[in-house]
Regions:
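Phosphate-handling DNA/RNA-contact segment within nucleic-acid enzymes
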Residues: 111, 150-240
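A short acidic, often aromatic-flanked loop/helix-cap motif at beta-alpha or helix-coil junctions
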Residues: 30-34, 149-152, 275-285
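Phosphate-handling catalytic cores of nucleic-acid transaction enzymes
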Residues: 141-145, 163, 246
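Residue-level detector of family-conserved "landmark" positions at structurally sensitive sites
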Residues: 26, 144-145, 273
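TOPRIM fold recognition
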Residues: 1-10, 197, 209-298
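Glycine-centered loop/turn motif at secondary-structure junctions
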Residues: 20, 138, 143, 215, ...
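Short, basic/aromatic recognition patches
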Residues: 131-148
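Non-catalytic accessory segments of DNA primases and related replication-initiation nucleases
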Residues: 1-132, 253, 257, 264-265
Length: 298
């Protein structure tokens, strides 16, 4: 590879880092114009949530993103004002073609994940009440099913379509079926949302179950994680413009930040932790369990 090619790759990687997409140590860039997956600095072992595409042909340009967060960075070796008309046209056609390819590939992955998720869900058994996670969290099985040692939870959207499933291990580790479409998706914890009762959106299924138990007059769902709260809340708002929507994030810094963002974007209220939350509680499920144990002020 020529020195010029190495320079282009270095500039591309630097632009990604500046835009919030940092590659994991040892990851290399292949500038062949094809879509590649790559490990990011904050990926766990075995994860490759990053993707990129880099062209060396004039004008050298690329794009990269994080499938987990939706963050995306575009880069070109030339400033827009320095591109010739021919280069602008080449770049525009390239971007349009690659965007169409990327969207088609993403839709195919989503369809496959939904099909695999449906198979898993249909072949799972009702969850055992003695499952270690349920016992430790003091949760009833509810809608949960089980395959082997894993709890299986359905991930759906507001049309009722199954997007995929979430697996919960006995130790509490969670993962979604690969390729699943997360935006706007959720896990039910009680009655199906229909716009007739306030909708409370939590992060995890256990927390949604806890709030549903504490507030049976509302409808609680799990928005999957802090980063997905906004998209789920916005989908609900678009479906029910006048509905009372309440965001119920976890108590950590990320939860508070993402919860506030979701509330603002969806014109919703937020349920903040009260001043008398027992020490050590990180979400409303912890609060419910502390209350069951008779912890002072719970």
């Amino acid at each position: 590879m020529s020195a010029t090619s190495w320079d282009i790759i270095e500039q591309f990687v630097a632009a990604l880092a500046a835009g919030g997409i940092e590659l994991a140590p040892g990851q290399s860039i292949t500038p062949d114009g094809k879509l590649h997956r790559v490990r990011l600095a904050n990926d766990k072992a075995g994860q490759r949530t990053g993707w990129y595409r880099l062209h060396l042909d004039p004008p050298p340009a690329g794009v990269a993103g994080d499938w987990r967060t939706g963050c995306q960075v575009k880069w070109c070796s030339k400033r827009p004002e320095r591109l010739s008309p021919a280069e602008r046209d080449t770049l525009r056609r390239r971007i349009e073609r690659e965007q169409a390819e990327r969207e088609a590939g993403e839709q195919a992955r989503h369809r496959e994940a939904a099909q695999r998720g449906a198979w898993v869900w249909n072949h799972a058994e009702p969850a055992s009440p003695s499952h270690e996670y349920l016992q430790r969290k003091r949760l009833a099985p509810g809608i949960a099913r089980q395959r082997g040692a894993s709890l299986v939870l359905p991930v759906v959207d507001f049309t009722g379509h199954l997007r995929g499933v979430q697996y919960v291990q006995p130790d509490g580790q969670k993962r979604f079926i690969a390729g699943m479409a997360k935006r706007g998706a959720w896990i039910p914890a009680g009655p199906k949302p229909d716009g007739t009762r306030p909708l409370w959106i939590c992060e995890g299924w256990g927390t949604a179950c806890a709030l549903q138990a504490m507030r049976p007059e509302v409808c609680c769902i799990a928005g999957l994680d802090a980063g997905n709260l906004a998209s789920t809340a916005i989908e609900a708002r678009n479906r029910w413009p006048a509905l009372d929507i309440v965001i119920c994030p976890d108590f950590d810094k990320v939860g508070r930040q993402k919860g506030q963002e979701a509330a603002e974007k969806a014109r919703a209220r937020i349920l903040p932790p009260t001043a008398d939350i027992p020490e050590g509680c990180t979400d409303w499920l912890d609060v419910l369990n502390a209350k069951r144990q008779g912890v002072a002020h719970a």
